[in-house]
Amino acid sequence: MGKNLTKRSEDYSKWYNELVVKADLAENSAVRGCMVIKPYGYAIWEKMQAELDRMFKETGHQNAYFPLFVPKHLFEAEEKNAEGFAKECAVVTHYRLKNDPDKPGKLMVDPDAKLEEELVVRPTSEAIIWNTYKNWIQSYRDLPIKVNQWANVVRWEMRTRLFLRTAEFLWQEGHTAHATKDEALEETELMNNIYAEFAENFMAMPVVKGSKTESERFAGALETYCIEALMQDGKALQAGTSHFLGQNFAEAFDVKFATKEGGLEHVWATSWGVSTRLMGALIMTHSDDNGLVLPPNLAPIQVVIVPIYRSEEQLDQISEVANELVKELRAVGVSVKFDNNDNQKPGWKFAQYELQGVPLRLAIGPKDLEKGTVELARRDTLTKEFVNRSEVVEKIKALMTEIQDSLFDKAKQYRNEHITEVDSFDDFKKVLKEKGGFISAHWDGTPETENKIKDLTKATIRCVPFDRKEGAGECVLTGNPSEGRVLFAKAY
């Protein structure tokens, strides 16, 4: 129950871990670093998937599916990409097991079943996809290709946390091929904007759009655009990335096309993705010491109706009203559950739905039947009011928008209050220690300074904001000339 959660102010990390498990979102599995996403958690992910999938298709993208395994020679074809992911790769070396002759009932890897070439379990799919695109692209008429894949990937993480960092996770990865550099850059920007729109309109999570520094870019990319969000503990979270790959992968896999003019050129590429890490972002942006707080646009259950009764006769009367409400709410697009399960008492249900972040709860008892009212409770504000039965549906419709907007405004206010401009390294360290959040500071543009600041403070450059204040200044660490401010933060 919510009351058993560790308070955020006492131990934010412990609060998060407890909430994920107690709200029935996910749990650890028998495989170290891998999670089980439980039905309620998966229902939220499905809502995310559905909205993103719609947005992708509305911008001309199609879904496809590519193999989980990547032959090692393909994986290493694009050198920077291979080097960047090498230490995180799981590798298949054999293709069967056999009975262990020394241990009856046990199995062993068959030493005679060694693969001729090792297979990398995909940490990302550029290699297998670009090897495929080579067969799909001959002419400018075959372009652009705009494909998305919903899949699982494996990156062998040692220190894992549910949703935020797991060895296996679910994600979508888009891979596009274009005839021109400008078209590929437009695609990179478009997808980053789509991620920002999704984060703000559906997750009610304000984000900063920007580009990564060279050392923070995706391995093999010429540019990485990103959206960065701020969690309630003052740490940043990278919520989505979109990469301009130039012609690197086309050159690595020799993907060329015949131009309109009759020449032969390498195609231009992008890739972009978000993952179940968004679940962690959603949880940490809005939730409180009582449990999960979900924006209505992503809540699997937007309204729950709980009957309060002492007899079967009362339950029958309440059920009649509740079932009418269910029909009326569903007719206007509201997701609603009537919880008439008699295995648990109303008090337990109230606490459970509060813990699981259901935006609105309706309680109907015998007195409500007499008065023609229902009790309506908001999860975000924990306030209650009585509403006339005839006005409930319109009230709920209005509240869906009001709650969504209110959660965004609250998160945006917190974010804005935690963007601090500093001009000295002493102030930088002080703000980082005492306040956290984003620190807007001048940087001299060198990876050496970037790394030194990271070593000294554990803060990284989250992004160079697209809307940053241009203007010369002095680097916060070295005093060398700076072209403009960037955003630093400690991050997940």
UniProtKB/Swiss-Prot annotation:
Name of a matching Pfam family: ProRS-C_1
GO annotation, cellular component aspect: aminoacyl-tRNA synthetase multienzyme complex; cytoplasm
Per its UniProt entry, what is the enzyme's top EC class, as one word?
Answer: ligase
Report the catalytic activity.
Answer: tRNA(Pro) + L-proline + ATP = L-prolyl-tRNA(Pro) + AMP + diphosphate
Does the entry feature the keyword ATP-binding, yes or no?
A: yes
Q: Where in the cell is it found?
A: Cytoplasm
Q: Name a GO molecular-function annotation.
A: ATP binding
Q: Which GO terms describe its biological process?
A: prolyl-tRNA aminoacylation
Query: What are the UniProt keywords, alphabetically?
Result: Aminoacyl-tRNA synthetase, ATP-binding, Cytoplasm, Ligase, Nucleotide-binding, Protein biosynthesis
Q: Which InterPro entries match?
A: aa-tRNA-synt_IIb, aa-tRNA-synth_II, aa-tRNA-synth_II/BPL/LPL, Anticodon-bd, Anticodon-bd_dom_sf, Pro-tRNA-ligase_IIa_arc-type, Pro-tRNA_ligase_II_C, Pro-tRNA_synth_II
Q: Domain description from the entry?
A: Consists of three domains: the N-terminal catalytic domain, the anticodon-binding domain and the C-terminal extension.
| NCBIfam families membership | proS_fam_I (TIGR00408)
Q: To which protein family does this belong?
A: Belongs to the class-II aminoacyl-tRNA synthetase family. ProS type 3 subfamily.
Q: What does the function comment of this entry state?
A: Catalyzes the attachment of proline to tRNA(Pro) in a two-step reaction: proline is first activated by ATP to form Pro-AMP and then transferred to the acceptor end of tRNA(Pro).
How does this protein assemble? Homodimer.
> Can you name this protein?
Proline--tRNA ligase
